Amino acid sequence: KNADYHQYFIHFPPTDMRMPRIYLGEILLHWCDTCHVPVLSGVCACGSPTRPVAVTPPGDARPAFPDDIERINRIFSDHFGAPLIPEGHIALLNKVPAADRMDEIVLGGAVVGAVRYLPGERRWEPLPRRAAAAYMRPTRRRVVVDDGAVPSIRDEGASVLAPGIISIDPAVAAGDEVFILSANGECIGVGRAKVDAATAGAMERGVVVRTRKNLDAAPLPGEATWEDTVRANEPVLADYEAASIRFVREAAEQNPHTPTISYSGGKDSLATLLIVLKAIGAVPILFSDTGLEFPETYENVDEVARRYGLEVFSACDKEAFWETFEENGPPAVDNRWCCRVCKLHPVGRLIEENWGECLSFIGQRKYESVRRMRSRRVWRNPHVPQQVSAAPIQQWTAMHVWLYIFREKAPYNRLYERGLDRIGCFMCPSSDLATFAIIGETHPELMKMWHEKLARWQEKQGLDPDWIESGLWRRQGSSDEEEEDSYN
């Protein structure tokens, strides 16, 4: 219904280059085949041993919310004629390094596929693994091969050759992802078509499908709920909670400054807030109001403050961003002046006016980025010398955070249910283009306004016509270094 949004951001297609693996910590995700739930240790609370889930590093998987599941099922149904994720099954998404955004899909303790956003085509692409056949029966984009071809394809990952094909779905185009089936309907592999169906039908020899390597991991389907998942992880959550509470108490004892919570409206700062409340009781909330927050974020800050009886100190300079924009243009991943101008400096002034100095507990986690992985757990930001920052959940994964929030029945930002995995400013240059596409659907008025601002700067500076369309506004130089604000 917001298809006109795509006129604002039309981007170069991603390359198929292999992305580097990023290890930020031990991958803790396991699966209990007895309870059919993810578990963050080698033993489930039910007493059963668990098995590791082979997700791509950094392995910071999260729950798939209903909107995520609806989107994935729509993508698979449009392409293969059948949805992937059945009702009542626990599904996880694991963001992996990609040219834009790519999420692995975990079902039954195995990665059964992925979805990848293709900005140049303004669509999501399904990337199934053979394991997906445990959950779906494709009716489109299928290639059926004779019995003689089955062993080499299934066991050795051989390509599908023209002589071995019994039938190919007429919808298959060159470059499409396809399921490869035996004559009796068994899925023996998946891959990418090298030619379209018509061409394949006329071929006497040659490769029709380049098969993707079959991986050993097999899912074990079974229904469960998130309440079941929380119960299965109770020993883990109790241990992580206790360690974080000890950290908060020690940090408060060693720093004489007024303790506060830096709250952004995101999941990590919410989990941190819950820990701090249990450790040392009610403390003030520091909220950095940039003027660029989502409406849902303001609602969440108010709801959290009411629920837990906390006073909110808001650092607000809503004109600072646009004044700096008029001089410098938009912020970029390698020049995030927005964090200094709209967050750090106003927060510093707020602290100085109210307490002189303070201790702030911040929802930083090492699984978020290389810089945060290397960060100390207690530090001072040079842009906010009035603030000592401390990170109680530095060792937590996103699954620890979500299961803890579910366990505590805490009011989280509902934007997470709309497909966003990180909550910040709506036009953050660190966002991938898939995120902007989602925001264009959920908040079209915000993205329309942002495009108009970019267009005026583009005209004023005489920038290349593709400066907006290609997403070049998000980067000023050629460096891959991304500035961190160290403030959640």
Q: How does the language model describe each region?
A:
Residues 4-262, 270, 274-283, 290-293, ...:
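RNA-binding accessory domains that recognize and position tRNA/RNA substrates
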Residues 13, 20-37, 43, 49-52, ...:
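Nucleotide-activated chemistry modules centered on ATP-dependent adenylation/adenylyltransferase
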